[in-house]
């Protein structure tokens, strides 16, 4: 009975252990799976290329904004919305802005390279006031007959023959010359002492053409579509585009011209609006038209300054000498300022004052821009001269004045280059009348700081500013950012790659540090370990070679006649090839070429991510998942690479044994010929050895003084000296007295040797099999005894553990019961004592009364 109970207990324990093992084994293992083409990206800096509709504009050789090196624009640009995506943007740290700045500077420099330097014109100019040839009436409020507008200057220049000089004359604007003495008759060009002056080419046009910046293959441009986006921070309405919208690179100050407008309300953008040192970019939600005119009809003349050098200057003016000017609708402008002030009050909650710049270069203190090839500098003090408090900011009637604001402008022909100091250009005069219409789409403002800005009186003063052209580009690129696509992703799945299983061999870590040619002197086996390293370094060499090629092209672009856009096209194409090669290289190393989903035999490590399988695939995006495992991506890649290397090694070893997998191939005629050849070689070897041994035996016997008569000589078998050769009646050991017969003939000799060899091999093989069988039997018996011992040991300790547990439980129960009884008894005594308190009081009172 006790034995039966023990077996039942053992059966229960066995079922319990088996169930636990089943539960543990029920948990499926996860394996690393490679995905190609996942929607993952990261912030990046890359070379953008341009797209433009070049056919709609002049393609003349010296057009500054010539875009014939750009790709044509896509007639149907695609924009893909990214739902459930939140991306951070920062317009103040955007590489696209820096890149556009460099591109526009390069375009300006490249367009002015072949043009004439007018440094020889830095001579004394004898100037007098200019009067017009005839007079016409003018109703413009900007009319001015002041002789201070232009000067008629004469000067000596070198002719085509270097040793001869002649006197020429030209008309210069007053702002372009400075007097060198007090008689106001001798002048010099304004920038001769500080700058290298270069004349813009006669055919150069400064009319900006819309440029679309595009990302190369492997990169994308993210676009923020929030209507109230201020340029920094997270954006929840994100889409992806291949190219930006058409951006006109308008070089202007104070007022942003011909840009894009806000779709909703006016937007105020600043890197830190509480810091008065930071400029404020105002994007309007409605345009204000500005019409600028140079009314006088100029003519242009050419002055030969030497061989191949011609200076183009103003010859004469037909009509009144009138100043240039710009007209703006007062109603539209005041309404715009009112809405801008209202928006600024949301940030400062004070009276908003607009006033003119406090000082600086003429490019900053005026609204400078290019109109029809002439550089205008307009005084905007009339525009920025208003104050908006809480009362008049709500009064829309105050902005209903339908008159026109006319702001006076000056024209300069010697213009300081905006991209760098110490350089200037001479803009040749444009013949005829000039009129251009533009749309004001934004403002560049700065806020006064210190105690003089009236902030202590509840007033904030804002002034127009400019000069940093990056702010102009930011006003258009604020909603874009460049990202690099990361198409390779890894994630855990339940699928495992079926591989050739084989024990892994440890590879020395020093192998990965070998150079591309470091294994040239090693064996083929040792060099095969570093094949992956060699592929990587080969790709790096290709990339480096292409990079050097681009540097050489960039350095010699003036010889190759390449524009900055042509260089960018080359860079974009090379970059796309590099990206593709890099991804395909990794897929090839991992054994995943041509696959979008590639399973591996690398187990997923829970330390990389402790999230469950369902949580990963059902609740996370690829972007979130990549951020989760970003720190372990390199480790995972290396494990996949090692697993693939081991797999290829196993496949090579398997292919080496593949011919043994089909026994029928053993009977192939080619194999039979091989078998016959081997048999003949073995027989020939045995015969040769037999002949050698026979010759050696003969030589040995000859040295002993005798020689056998023939191979048929019977040699008596030696017997012991103390035993007779025979026994009576024919008995005894007759077999031991017989002679050994030598074989007769060549075939008999070969057969005897082969038979002896086979018998020897058979006996040895039989002995080995018997020994192996005896050993296996002994080991099996010992193993069975050890297994039974372990089972009995486990059963014994199980019983002991069970008895100990029962004893511990009984002891605990008894202790708890005794403790409980005592607690109950104490509680009862306390309760009775409380109940007896009134009785004791009554008894005490009775005794006191008695």
From Swiss-Prot:
Could you list the residue ranges forming a coiled coil in this record?
Answer: 627-661
Region annotated V4 sits at: 378-409
Q: List the disulfide bonds.
A: 50-70, 115-201, 122-192, 127-153, 214-243, 224-235, 292-326, 371-436, 378-409, 592-598
Q: Which UniProt keywords apply?
A: AIDS, Apoptosis, Clathrin-mediated endocytosis of virus by host, Cleavage on pair of basic residues, Coiled coil, Disulfide bond, Fusion of virus membrane with host endosomal membrane, Fusion of virus membrane with host membrane, Glycoprotein, Host cell membrane, Host endosome, Host membrane, Host-virus interaction, Lipoprotein, Membrane, Palmitate, Signal, Transmembrane, Transmembrane helix, Viral attachment to host cell, Viral envelope protein, Viral immunoevasion, Viral penetration into host cytoplasm, Virion, Virus endocytosis by host, Virus entry into host cell
Question: How does it get modified post-translation?
Answer: Highly glycosylated by host. The high number of glycan on the protein is reffered to as 'glycan shield' because it contributes to hide protein sequence from adaptive immune system.
Ranges where the record places region Fusion peptide: 506-526
Membrane-side (Cytoplasmic) residue stretches:
700-850
Q: Where is this region: V2?
A: 153-192
MF terms from GO for this chain are:
structural molecule activity
Q: Which residues are glycosylated?
A: 84, 126, 133-134, 139, 152, 156, 184, 193, 226, 230, 237, 258, 272, 285, 297, 327, 334, 349, 379, 385, 397, 402, 433, 439, 453, 457, 605, 610, 619, 631, 668
InterPro entries, per database record: Gp120_core_sf, Gp160, GP41-like, HIV1_Gp120
Give the signal sequence positions: 1-28
Motif Di-leucine internalization motif mapped to chain? 849-850
Identify the HAMAP family for this entry. Answer: HIV_ENV (MF_04083)
Stated name of the protein: Envelope glycoprotein gp160
Q: Which organism is it from?
A: Human immunodeficiency virus type 1 group M subtype J (isolate SE9173) (HIV-1)
